[in-house]
Amino acid sequence: MVVVSATMYFPQQARAIMQQVPVEYQPQSEWDTMRQRHKLGDDQIVALWEWQRGMKDSHDDMSFTPPSLARITASTLIIYGDRDFLYPIEMAIEMYRAIPHSALWVVPNGGHGPIFRDAVPQFVKIALDFFSK
């Protein structure tokens, strides 16, 4: 298993952040990345972010706590950017400590969703190494 997002681990915090971060406050690097991926322009990007903000109410049944994370039996790779502007790194560390047979990869200079940007080659290598064990 690869844990890419921790929003379900802290649903209240995730909802609050999704509601508070207006599109215009997204970092320029995020806009640049989105513009490379979504060729229909800024209207498409804004619509995607608004759709994501709409997910804020969809995590009620997925509040993972350390005791529930401890029941995960699959080997789990947790990936986290050390410069995530939305969630503190302590979240990833707590998940790593709670999930048996887990590994934590902290992406240097990685923001929110670091494997979708410059870290793709490293992600592929680390994930393949992880799954080969």
Task: Indicate where each model-derived feature is located.
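Catalytic active-site module of serine/aspartate enzymes centered on a nucleophile-bearing elbow/loop
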Residues: 102-133
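Acidic catalytic loop of the alpha/beta-hydrolase fold
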Residues: 83-87, 113-114
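Active-site nucleophile elbow and catalytic-triad environment of alpha/beta-hydrolase enzymes
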Residues: 51-68
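Short alpha-helix in the alpha/beta-hydrolase fold that links the catalytic acid
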Residues: 74, 88-97
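Flexible "cap/lid" loop of the alpha/beta hydrolase fold
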Residues: 1-32
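Short aromatic-enriched loop/helix-cap "lid" or pocket-rim segments at secondary-structure transitions
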Residues: 13-17, 91, 117-120
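Short beta-strand/loop motif that positions the catalytic acidic residue
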Residues: 72, 78-80
